[in-house]
């Protein structure tokens, strides 16, 4: 289990999607070269756990008739659903994507990890550039919303380090917090040493992979009944040893998150990029 396996898994899915996407585009569209398939979120980062959903964004330039786009998308997606794949998808133009991202922080966050899979690579690149530019430009609006969402999530899911059956993704100190730290770093608000939580991310991700692999229907909560099996698979002596390391990993993430918000509060909202520029 590890990053290499997650990337290999993503690459295998990419290949299958690419063939199907291009075939369907050629069969249903008058200008198949003007659409693109991209991955966003965790799949966009190439971090695909065994039971993860596939987050897809299908882009087009608006020149095709809507009924052709619908027929194309259905022809592409229905066989994937029939195979049992869980797919969260959106179909948008560049301008639609940009507009929605300014209104919905979840969309904005997902676009930060956008990765081209097939079709018009220039269109994919333009949307990725828009996403990063708008995230940085609107950080004073987005970061308070991100902070609030993190606080709300902690209320719902608790703190990973102190839970008997933690949600590895949603709990405080888990994978979603690590992704939030990446987003904050990309905003330019403050510099963040993400290397400080690299080992934490690797461990929590590996635990999640084993959890998904042992039970494809499982989600992200590490139940007591699963802990011994996961521990032995990863080379720990028992569940207690595993959970001790998971708690340490979560506390490292939690500490970096607290430190990051403290630094942002100390700047009074003035970005690190702008401070450095003014100091020259």
Write out the residue ranges for each language-model feature.
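Extended, Lys/Arg-enriched charged tracts that mediate electrostatic binding to polyanionic substrates
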Residues: 14-18, 23-24, 28, 33-36, ...
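Conserved nucleotidyltransferase catalytic core and NTase-mimicking acidic/glycine-rich helix/loop elements
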Residues: 135-272
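Conserved catalytic core of two-metal-ion nucleotidyltransferases
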Residues: 10-18, 24, 59, 67-122
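A glycine-rich phosphate-binding loop feature that marks nucleotide/adenosyl-phosphate handling sites
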Residues: 92-100, 224-228, 270, 274-276
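Active-site nucleotide-donor binding segment shared across nucleotidyl transfer reactions
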Residues: 18-70
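N-terminal membrane-targeting/anchoring modules of bacterial envelope and secretion proteins
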Residues: 58, 75, 123-124, 128, ...
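Short, polar/flexible loop-turn hinges at active-site or ligand-entry regions and domain interfaces
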Residues: 60-69, 117-118, 137, 188-193
